[in-house]
Amino acid sequence: NLVQFSNMIQCANHGSRPSLAYADYGCYCSAGGSGTPVDELDRCCKTHDDCYARATKSYSCTPYWTLYSWQCIEKTPTCDSKTGCQRFVCDCDATAAKCFAKAPYNKENYNIDPKKRCQ
């Protein structure tokens, strides 16, 4: 779920940036999403959105509210859930959190005007 995803982000980036810094970034790191991702970090968010869409389609679940089991092992989010929607959503979140940790954060892409930048 969103709280677990936030905690995974903190695990992967070692607490270097608050999770909310990603909540209104680029074209895809917020509710909805459209157009071309503005950079590598925004591509991480688009991939995460696409992963959640696959979870919804494949498992008829609601990824934003799905609880799963995971651990932060050596600063790496690691999924414990074994099957179905829980595992799929956990993998989506863990992959995105690791992607966020590797991608540069460009302050000019925070809180952009999607009507101008997300065509």
From Swiss-Prot:
Q: Which UniProt keywords apply?
A: Disulfide bond, Secreted
| MF term (GO), any | phospholipid binding
Record's GO cellular component terms: extracellular region
Q: Where is this region: Important for membrane-damaging activities in eukaryotes and bacteria?
A: 107-117
> Where is this gene product found?
Secreted
| Expression by tissue | Expressed by the venom gland.
GO BP annotations of the record are: arachidonate secretion; lipid catabolic process; phospholipid metabolic process
Q: Where does it primarily localize? A: secreted
Q: In its UniProt entry, what is this protein called?
A: Basic phospholipase A2 homolog 1
Q: Does the keyword S-adenosyl-L-methionine apply?
A: no
Q: Which InterPro entries match?
A: PLipase_A2, PLipase_A2_Asp_AS, PLipase_A2_dom, PLipase_A2_dom_sf, PLipase_A2_His_AS
Q: Please state which protein family the record places this protein in.
A: Belongs to the phospholipase A2 family. Group I subfamily. D49 sub-subfamily.
- Record-linked PROSITE patterns: PA2_ASP, PA2_HIS
Keyword Electron transport applies: no
Disulfide bridge map? 11-72, 27-118, 29-45, 44-99, 51-92, 61-85, 79-90
Database matches in PANTHER family: PHOSPHOLIPASE A2 (PTHR11716:SF94), PHOSPHOLIPASE A2 FAMILY MEMBER (PTHR11716)
